[in-house]
Amino acid sequence: MIDWITSQGQGLLGAYWTPLWILIRAVIIVVPLLLCVAYLILWERKLIGWMHVRIGPNRVGPLGLLQPIADVLKLLLKEVMMPTQVSRGMYLIAPLMVLMPAVAVWAVIPFQAEVVLADVNAGLLYVMAISSVGVYGVILAGWASNSKYAFIGAMRAAAQMVSYEIAMGFALVTVLMVAGSLNLSAIVNGQNTGYFADMGINILSWNWLPLLPMFGVYFISGVAETNRHPFDVVEGESEIVAGHMIEYSGMGFALFFLAEYINMIIISTMTALMFLGGWAPPIDSVLTNAIPGFFWLVIKVFLLLSVFIWIRASFPRYRYDQIMRLGWKVFIPLTVAWLIIVAIWIKSPWNIWH
């Protein structure tokens, strides 16, 4: 069908079709992504409410399903107040610098076999590079606000995000080593081959099992990277109020939270692609293969996002020194050690990947 649409479009519009088709595909990704963020916030409030033996949002619409729409309207109608002491240009650019990398990452994320905006061979490298740019927007927000609270929050964010990016990078390098490719689709396809996959038990052939420490480190580091609870000292309410966002209101404030929730979805999607077989079903059968691969990926991402929320509801906030100690003294040495083990494993006669 996609080939038919492409051929018809080229016949009608000629050279104008290619940029228009790229724009259409980008809109097809971004609009559902924004809806996912809206209802992820509702799911978070509902799930935490159930964990606390509360009802959660239930006033706007049936079962509270229109609550995200009401929240968006509220933020759109709020006055954007700009304190007199801020550096105006940098203050306005900072939220966009946080949001744009979070959206740009989706250009190379495959949703199913051959369903991707740009199927580049260096997709994994692109994700690692673009996702690390958002920290500059956080630093810029803290600096431009000319507030002590905002600056402290920005410095905490910079140190925390850089620290955990190292562990995440090492975890992804091990996936690169066993897959032998930087192409995200090739990494997913490589997980669905081998002894267990031939038996129809795909779930045991995925990377989560042989790379279990890396799987745990990558996901927990992702929680820290997104400044989510219990790693949310960047915006610890009892210490520095909203951290680098303290001087923002209205849509400026909303853009930071939009980027945070998009990054949560990115971490969950990358975890599913790198370690949980992507769009492949856990069991290879006629029934599971009848379900489109996109839905299997959505199910895995939804479960991982629910773990994000479960962690928030269950654990107290760590002290800043504990967060730094976990990153530098536990995760980085662990990932380096497992990287060496995997390298030896690949060169040994017991290599299970090739």
UniProtKB/Swiss-Prot annotation:
Membrane topology (UniProt)? Multi-pass membrane protein
- Class of this enzyme: translocase
* One GO term describing the cellular component: plasma membrane
Any idea where this protein resides? Cell inner membrane
Give the chief site where it resides. membrane
What start and end residues bound the annotated signal peptide? none
User: GO molecular function terms here?
Assistant: NADH dehydrogenase activity; oxidoreductase activity, acting on NAD(P)H, quinone or similar compound as acceptor; quinone binding
Quickly give the catalysed reaction. a quinone + NADH + 5 H(+)(in) = a quinol + NAD(+) + 4 H(+)(out)
Pfam families hit by this protein: NADHdh
Any stretches that span the bilayer, and where are they?
22-42, 91-111, 124-144, 168-188, 203-223, 255-275, 291-311, 326-346
Which EC numbers characterise this protein's activity in its record? 7.1.1.-
Q: Which UniProt keywords apply?
A: Cell inner membrane, Cell membrane, Membrane, NAD, Quinone, Translocase, Transmembrane, Transmembrane helix, Ubiquinone
GO terms, biological process: aerobic respiration
Q: How does it assemble?
A: NDH-1 is composed of 14 different subunits. Subunits NuoA, H, J, K, L, M, N constitute the membrane sector of the complex.
Instruction: Family membership, please give it.
Output: Belongs to the complex I subunit 1 family.
Q: Report the protein's function.
A: NDH-1 shuttles electrons from NADH, via FMN and iron-sulfur (Fe-S) centers, to quinones in the respiratory chain. The immediate electron acceptor for the enzyme in this species is believed to be ubiquinone. Couples the redox reaction to proton translocation (for every two electrons transferred, four hydrogen ions are translocated across the cytoplasmic membrane), and thus conserves the redox energy in a proton gradient. This subunit may bind ubiquinone.
Q: Which HAMAP family match?
A: NDH1_NuoH
What is the designated name of this protein? NADH-quinone oxidoreductase subunit H
Q: Which gene encodes it?
A: nuoH
